[in-house]
Amino acid sequence: MKFEMNNREWIIKEVEQNELCSAHNDFSGDGCYYGTTFPSIQEIWLYKDIKKETKEKTLYHELMHCYLYTFISFNNINFSIDDFCDISANSHNIIHKIVKEYFNEQDKWKI
């Protein structure tokens, strides 16, 4: 699914576990990755064979990475608790809307 964040187009796609491990140079094959975010190519990859509830939580997590990469250019900034709360409050509606659209789109294609 394609979506925009701060006028940048991103893609969410579901992939096999070996693709996630390859992206992390981890060939242990123990099913350790549920998702990852690639800011350089503006893609979020989700492990396709996890339960919907886990996939949803993973997508929220990865979208927070996306939000941080897109809106907050930082490098090793130490956030205060108030900074974290502001980031969470400001990103909440954006991220929840994308997750809702993603799973509504997924449900349309179920047989």
What are these regions (language model features)?
Residues M1-T54, T70-I111:
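Metalloprotease/metallohydrolase-associated module, dominated by Zn2+-dependent proteases
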Residues K57-Y69:
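Active-site recognition of the HExxH zinc-binding catalytic motif
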